[in-house]
Amino acid sequence: MCLFRQARRFVLAFTGVMAAQVPKLEPPVLAELSQELQRFQVGDQQLWEALVQDTARRPQELKPLDIVYLLDAFRRALSFGVRPAPALEATCQRIMECYQDFNSKQCTGALGSVCRLSGHIDSSQQYKVMHLLLGQWLASQPAKWETTPSNQVISVAVSLSGLGVLSDRTETFLAAASSWALRWGAPEGGALSAEDLVVLLWSLKEMTPLGLARYRELVQLSLVRIRAAATYEDWTLVRQGQALEVLLSAKHALVEDGADLAVAEELLLGIEAPMTAVAS
């Protein structure tokens, strides 16, 4: 017990010294430190509080990559009981000042964190930040998204699915993402796996009041791929649930748009049976 107490005192003293050094660190080092603390699951409250307060004190020094790292770390540190609200507010304000400096990958990362911080960021600030980052991401893409990484498209789609309020930029993304998927993602040998297609269709469904009806061609093409290549038993429960939601929405989309019912029903039945068997 004596050794345990000595070890605990040493750890507390060590983290106390580290916390005292935080204000002296340059922002890139601060951001890297936040990632390392998260990576090794260091939940020391004193150290995290120092990171929160220092980030809130000098947000104007943060560059896009620093912001991406810090947002990700603070979001994950919520599981330690960290309360990062002051840092999040200051960081979001900084994004609104420097969003044009973000590259495509950095926009994707920041969107992924901001969308998951509902309840910890003011809703109006959250919407403004996501709106600006989405606009910057769209402006960074090549014509027809020919060389846009598929994981970025999927990530942005998932991030936007919880936005709730559609805007002109969201509509631009929806149209471009569905066209991109038809051209590069869904065809046999395309950039998207069966699981990716489920995630994309689910995200499009969540952002579209009429579900998947407006994406009938993409639905038909995707269902063929999903039926042929999906390994439902390897998917998480969340993914299986999304797949069932997509299947239900696909039924309405194919029927309401006047697709050939016999072909559509055969395709849907071929997916529904194994999917529901695994989910149950």
Predicted regions and their residues:
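Eukaryotic RNA-binding helical-repeat scaffolds
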Residues: 1-280
